[in-house]
């Protein structure tokens, strides 16, 4: 048997790989090849030139396979060669030349068989199949690895691959949940996954999703009458005001699915605005009662015998709603056609020299 001479190692393609720093042993590749691979079988060729060429090719494959990171995978996250790529797709796939020689990954057929086993192990641990399929895949890996032999007739190299793939499959199957189920060490088995969606539209209203906690003030609509006699009718979640003419005006919903849409301050302002009288005459016009009083005076005096005071002031006054600072003093009296007696006279001092104002409520 002739002594094997060292062949020049072909440098890896620098434009397609990224070279990480890997730990190297002091033992040469030729010595590792001799004790790890050639020990199990005799060389297939007996000529010095043939063995030299074969050993050189094996050293090149051992130096190249998965010893460097794939540049396409690092830059773009994908590689067109997928599992057939000679370079590592991630740090977990990085290998050293010594590991390739010890596992027999020095020929094209051995590397192809290893790639098939690796792909089957990854597919088995993907979690898309049931636990029984993982067991079947593991058995298939063991059977295939046992019956597979390399081009040089090495059975030990296939056994190295078999034992290595068994550890990979066992670790992957324990880490990845199967069929939506997960087994945690020291705990019970979690059956299935949570299917409840807390943000489903028919469980929580849209407004409630923006509250970290429920508001302190929780109000519900109720029937009441404002100062103008319009009754607020509650129908469902909306407030409806029915005025004297029978027209109904629906306001925005005060409460939406159990959560108040408006705050307490906005609701107070809203009720205050709606409480103003909408059926009174326009501004700068005399009230209906004063118009009736003026008519009775022009037709023959006060038929009811009630004194009408400050009629001139009354003509210039306005029938305003609560909160209107007109600055005029207005006093109401019973008209000749009305059989009702005036109820109350309210006086209010005006600020900043505006004079006295009157808030007058008329009973119909």
Swiss-Prot record:
Its BP terms in the Gene Ontology are: 3'-UTR-mediated mRNA stabilization; cellular response to heat; mRNA stabilization; post-transcriptional regulation of gene expression; regulation of translation; response to heat
- Recorded GO terms, molecular function? mRNA 3'-UTR AU-rich region binding; mRNA binding; protein-RNA adaptor activity; RNA binding; zinc ion binding
Keyword Metal-binding set for record: yes
Q: Does the keyword Zinc-finger apply?
A: yes
Composition bias, Basic and acidic residues = 346-357
Q: Name one GO cellular component term.
A: cytoplasm
Q: Where in the cell is it found?
A: Cytoplasm
Zinc finger regions, C3H1-type: 64-92
Region described as Disordered:
340-364
| SMART domains (UniProt xref) | ZnF_C3H1 (SM00356)
**Consequence of gene loss (knockout):** RNAi-mediated knockdown in the bloodstream form is lethal and causes a reduction in chaperone mRNA levels in response to heat-induced stress. RNAi-mediated knockdown in the procyclic form causes sensitivity to cytoplasmic protein folding stress (induced by high temperature, puromycin, arsenite, MG132 or ethanol), characterized by a reduction in chaperone mRNA levels.
Give the record's PTM text.
Phosphorylated at the N-terminus. CK1.2-dependent phosphorylation may lead to proteasome-dependent degradation of ZC3H11 in absence of stress.
InterPro entries tied to this protein: Znf_CCCH, Znf_CCCH_sf
In chain numbering, motif MKT1-binding motif lies across 194-199
State what induces this protein: Induced during the response to misfolded or unfolded cytoplasmic proteins; including during thermal stress, sodium arsenite, or acidic pH (at protein level). Not induced by endoplasmic reticulum stress.
UniProt keywords (A-Z) are:
Cytoplasm, Metal-binding, Phosphoprotein, RNA-binding, Stress response, Translation regulation, Zinc, Zinc-finger
- According to its UniProt entry, what is the function of this protein? RNA-binding protein involved in regulation of mRNA stability. Binds AU-rich regions in the 3'-UTR of mRNAs and promotes their stabilization by recruiting a MKT1-containing complex. Stabilizes chaperone mRNAs during stress that causes an accumulation of misfolded or unfolded proteins in the cytoplasm.
How are the domains described in the entry? The zinc finger domain binds AU-rich regions in the 3'-UTR of mRNAs.
Subunit relationships: Interacts (via MKT1-binding motif) with MKT1. Interacts with PBP1 (via C-terminus); the interaction is direct.
Its protein name is RNA-binding protein ZC3H11
Q: Gene encoding this chain? A: ZC3H11
